[in-house]
């Protein structure tokens, strides 16, 4: 499912227009992105949590040459699914 299909589904389920559904989806994405970028954890009970996680610096290898190289520490976005979401996906 792509964004357009999700907007169509949201508009149908919320009994609203596609324009309103698209605006709400964009606002949700922007809000979660901004909160996680500011170091906040966004939790939607039953669905899951969005947060920033720190990856430690480590040593890697260049796949072409085999030379060792340092990979710096970085912060990445992460999603942890909630119990209701996991149960729905697994068919329980």
Predicted features, each with a name:
Residues 1-92:
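Strongly charged
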């Amino acid at each position: 499912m792509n964004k357009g299909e999700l907007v169509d589904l949201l508009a149908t389920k919320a009994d609203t227009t596609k324009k309103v559904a698209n605006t709400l989806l964009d606002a949700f994405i922007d809000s979660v992105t901004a909160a996680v970028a500011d170091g906040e954890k966004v939790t939607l009970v039953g669905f899951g949590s969005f947060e920033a996680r720190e990856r430690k610096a480590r040593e890697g290898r260049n796949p072409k040459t085999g030379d060792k190289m340092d990979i710096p520490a970085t912060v990445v976005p992460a999603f942890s699914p909630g119990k209701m979401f996991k149960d729905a996906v697994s068919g329980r």
